[in-house]
């Protein structure tokens, strides 16, 4: 016994948010029982407007799931009798050769060149076959503006193209392959499919529509409905959509590649339709169909519409230990008024879902900023406050920041922004900061500093060596690629000369034979052989260069892999070393002792310090600290002074200072940061507990490590001479 129901097709992907929901993928077919809509009070005719119904409960025939889905994400197809489930139809496949029939060599070759059916190559949510995607991406990257793309045949034979298509997709390195070879492989792919991308089942309907083509919106809508018919396997529809996106992108740069919609349709309509299956009388109509499809942007998916309102889930008492009544000041993840730089430092190299909250930089009362780690980057989200309510956007519905954060520790932020599909998983706690320095006496900490610094220096040298090798290899690879392109152009020129000479040589040889001039015949043949020999030499040279390039590209990838494996260790070692150094500095350890542990008593680097000189004028802050002076006054004070003369003043940037120093006869300015870890010119060197300590350090250490144009030390305080 069957019941009446309705069919819908998914227009957008939807990822379920509740247990009772089901996932949707573009093109999924869904069935809804008529009785379920009647029970909700909907009348006949409303089933055709699912966006007005809101959430529907039905069965996804594509995935076999049953549950709720949003009506704004689907379109109505029609009525359907609902019966017990039947086995899914098998995807189309080539027929076997009848027993007893003989195969010619051509048949064997053709069978060997047949790819799996599209339905066997991929499945949603993938948008197209992996190999096709890789070919298209490589072609668009290298040949989007190539004036001979898809119109010039490469020198590769059928076997070579088939070998390329047979390769394991992830292992294929298409960067080294000429764009014309890629284009031929792309065409070969379409021809080697057992069935055309547009199956023969819809030829007749397309042909009947074709004479009516007037580029009208009505025709395009009819064509869309036809191509997206359930009679076409879903993978065919997705593949066609992907190809049309590619063709549309090419047509957008037709001023350079000369591939407008008409030219593309002439090239590819035989491959998409396989004209052998259709009457030659209809060729022009089918070309026109593809031209219309390429010329429109209907294949560009629009953003999914807003979800319809859904009844709120019944609230249950939280049993995860979260307390919405906790004060914000007591929350471990609330850090108060800290800078963005400090936040970046705390979230550096952390996992996705790590978060903290700070006061908003706008300083508006009640506004805060949530910083969340997602995709290896920090995402800043403003928390708004109005009329006693909090939230990321209107309407503001949470009674407190604590309630807001606790909500999104259980629910994905995709509710707020679809791109933020992550929960607030790992709070950065202000109560449980890692205590890196475990030792309890200065000498033990100093030994550890020496140990970590040694490891850091070794890793740095290894990384620098790999980086030099990486840069050199990259340059050599680029040179070889350029040389291969030059070889290709040279071979092309020589082959054209060879064809020209061959064409004219026949005429002259016939002429000289009639005249009996054997000497001229031999000269022509000798020149022709010489030209052919030269072409062979160039082709051999190109082949050897391509082999070298392939080996070097493998080495290049290996170097890159090793650099990436070292980088996290290097970052962690630097961070640990700097924390040990900062601990010792805060304990008042003299610079000479730090120098010994760092092993650079006789060298100058970022931590190198000379013996403290109690007689230096730098100890008197009045010789260089000029207070609230501005840039113009600073330049007037320093004009005509020798290199290294400097002063420190308050910066126009609130809470910071500026250093003005004479370099090569000119006055330069640089900001001195004031952070929670201390003063400094840049991270991670904001380590100095006072401006005086910073000035004493850079009295003998060049500023060049922070700025290439500042190769100078803070040698002479601006007022030092007057005070002596």
Swiss-Prot record:
Family matches, as CDD domains: iSH2_PIK3R1, RhoGAP_p85, SH2_cSH2_p85_like, SH2_nSH2_p85_like, SH3_PI3K_p85alpha
Positions bearing the site annotation: Arginine finger: 151
Phenotype when changing residue 649 to W: In SHORTS; impairs interaction between PIK3R1 and IRS1 and reduces AKT1-mediated insulin signaling
GO cellular component terms listed in the entry, alphabetical order: cell-cell junction; cis-Golgi network; cytoplasm; cytosol; membrane; nucleus; perinuclear endoplasmic reticulum membrane; perinuclear region of cytoplasm
InterPro entries, alphabetized: ISH2_PIK3R1 (IPR044124), PI3K_P85_iSH2 (IPR032498), PI3K_p85alpha_SH3 (IPR035591), PI3kinase_P85_cSH2 (IPR035020), PI3kinase_P85_nSH2 (IPR035022), Rho_GTPase_activation_prot (IPR008936), RhoGAP_dom (IPR000198), SH2 (IPR000980)
Modified residues (N-acetylserine): 2
Domain SH3: 3-79
Post-translational modification: Polyubiquitinated in T-cells by CBLB; which does not promote proteasomal degradation but impairs association with CD28 and CD3Z upon T-cell activation. In adipose tissue, polyubiquitinated by the BCR(KBTBD2) E3 ubiquitin ligase complex; recognized by KBTBD2 through the SH2 domains, undergoes 'Lys-48'-linked polyubiquitination leading to its degradation.
Modified residue annotations for Phosphoserine: 154, 279, 608
MF GO annotations: 1-phosphatidylinositol-3-kinase regulator activity; enzyme-substrate adaptor activity; ErbB-3 class receptor binding; insulin binding; insulin receptor binding; insulin receptor substrate binding; insulin-like growth factor receptor binding; kinase activator activity
Start and end residues of each stretch annotated as Disordered: 80-108
Tissue specificity: Isoform 2 is expressed in skeletal muscle and brain, and at lower levels in kidney and cardiac muscle. Isoform 2 and isoform 4 are present in skeletal muscle (at protein level).
Signal peptide (residue range): none
Keywords linked to the UniProt accession: Acetylation, Disease variant, Dwarfism, GTPase activation, Host-virus interaction, Phosphoprotein, Protein transport, Repeat, SH2 domain, SH3 domain, Stress response, Transport, Ubl conjugation
SH2 domain residues: 333-428, 624-718
In-chain residues carrying the UniProt-annotated modification Phosphotyrosine: 467, 580
Family: Belongs to the PI3K p85 subunit family.
Known disease link: Agammaglobulinemia 7, autosomal recessive: A primary immunodeficiency characterized by profoundly low or absent serum antibodies and low or absent circulating B-cells due to an early block of B-cell development. Affected individuals develop severe infections in the first years of life.
Protein name, per record: Phosphatidylinositol 3-kinase regulatory subunit alpha
Lineage: Eukaryota, Metazoa, Chordata, Craniata, Vertebrata
Name of the gene: PIK3R1
């Amino acid at each position: 016994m069957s019941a009446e129901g309705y069919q819908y097709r998914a227009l957008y992907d939807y990822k379920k948010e509740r247990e009772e929901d089901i996932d949707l993928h573009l093109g999924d077919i869904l069935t809804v029982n008529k009785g379920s809509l009647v029970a909700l009070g909907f009348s006949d005719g409303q089933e055709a407007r699912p966006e007005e119904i809101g959430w529907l409960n039905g069965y996804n025939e594509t995935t076999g799931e049953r549950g709720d889905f949003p009506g704004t994400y689907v379109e109505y197809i029609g009525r359907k009798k609902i019966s017990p489930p039947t086995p899914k139809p098998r995807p189309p496949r080539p027929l076997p050769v009848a027993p007893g029939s003989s195969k010619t060599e051509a048949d064997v070759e053709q069978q060997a060149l047949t790819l799996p059916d599209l339905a066997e190559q991929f499945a949603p949510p993938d948008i197209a076959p992996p190999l096709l995607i890789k070919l298209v991406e490589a072609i668009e990257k290298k040949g989007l503006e190539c004036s001979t793309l898809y119109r010039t045949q490469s020198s590769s034979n059928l076997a070579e193209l088939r070998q390329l298509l047979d390769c394991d997709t992830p292992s294929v390195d298409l960067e080294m392959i000429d764009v014309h070879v890629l284009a031929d492989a792309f065409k070969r792919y379409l021809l080697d499919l057992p069935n055309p991308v547009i199956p023969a089942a819809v030829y007749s309907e397309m042909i009947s529509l074709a004479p009516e083509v007037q580029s009208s919106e009505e025709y395009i809508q009819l064509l869309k409905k036809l191509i997206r018919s359930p009679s076409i396997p879903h993978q065919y529809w997705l593949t066609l959509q992907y190809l049309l996106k590619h063709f549309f992108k090419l047509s957008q740069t037709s001023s350079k590649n000369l591939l407008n919609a008409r030219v593309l349709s002439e090239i590819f309509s035989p491959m998409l339709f396989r004209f052998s299956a259709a009457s030659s009388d209809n060729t022009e109509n089918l070309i026109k169909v593809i031209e219309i499809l390429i010329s429109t942007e209907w294949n560009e998916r629009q953003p999914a519409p807003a979800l319809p309102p859904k009844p709120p889930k019944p609230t249950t008492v939280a049993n995860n230990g979260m307390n919405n009544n906790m004060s914000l000041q007591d929350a471990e993840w609330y850090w108060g008024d800290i800078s963005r730089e400090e936040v970046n430092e705390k979230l550096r190299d952390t996992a996705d879902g790590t978060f903290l909250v700070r006061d908003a930089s706008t300083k508006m009362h009640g506004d805060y900023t949530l910083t969340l780690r997602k995709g290896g980057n920090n995402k800043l989200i403003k928390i708004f406050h109005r009329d006693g309510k909090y939230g990321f956007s209107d309407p503001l519905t949470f009674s407190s920041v604590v309630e807001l954060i606790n909500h999104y520790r259980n629910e994905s932020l995709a509710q707020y922004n679809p791109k933020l599909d992550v929960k607030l998983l790992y709070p950065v706690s202000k109560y449980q900061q890692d205590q890196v320095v475990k030792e309890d006496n200065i000498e033990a900490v100093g030994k550890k500093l020496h140990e970590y610094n040694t490891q850091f220096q070794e890793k740095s040298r290894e990384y620098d060596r790999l980086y030099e090798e990486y840069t050199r290899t990259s340059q050599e690879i680029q040179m070889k690629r350029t040389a291969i392109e030059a070889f290709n152009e040279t071979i092309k020129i020589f082959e054209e000369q060879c064809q020209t000479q061959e064409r004219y040589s026949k005429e002259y040889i016939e002429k000289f034979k009639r005249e009996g001039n054997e000497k001229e015949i031999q000269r022509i043949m000798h020149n022709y052989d010489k030209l052919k020999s030269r072409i062979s030499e160039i082709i051999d040279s190109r082949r050897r260069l391509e082999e070298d390039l392939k080996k070097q590209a493998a080495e290049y990838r290996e170097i890159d892999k090793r650099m990436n494996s070292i980088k996290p260790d290097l970052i962690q070692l630097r961070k640990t070393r700097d924390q040990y150094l900062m601990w010792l500095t805060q304990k008042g350890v003299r610079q000479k002792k730090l120098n010994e542990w760092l092993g650079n008593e006789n060298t100058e680097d970022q931590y190198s310090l000379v013996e403290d000189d109690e007689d230096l004028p730098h100890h008197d802050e009045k010789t260089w600290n000029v207070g609230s002076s501005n840039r113009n006054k600073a330049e007037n004070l320093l004009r005509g002074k020798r290199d290294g003369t400097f002063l420190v003043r308050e910066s126009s940037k609130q809470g910071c200072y500026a250093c003005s120093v004479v370099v090569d006869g000119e006055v330069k300015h640089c900001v001195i940061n004031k952070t929670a870890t201390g003063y400094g010119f840049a991270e991670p060197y904001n380590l100095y507990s006072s401006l005086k300590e910073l000035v004493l350090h850079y009295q003998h250490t060049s500023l060049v490590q922070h700025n290439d144009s500042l190769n100078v030390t803070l040698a002479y305080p601006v007022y030092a001479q007057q005070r002596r």
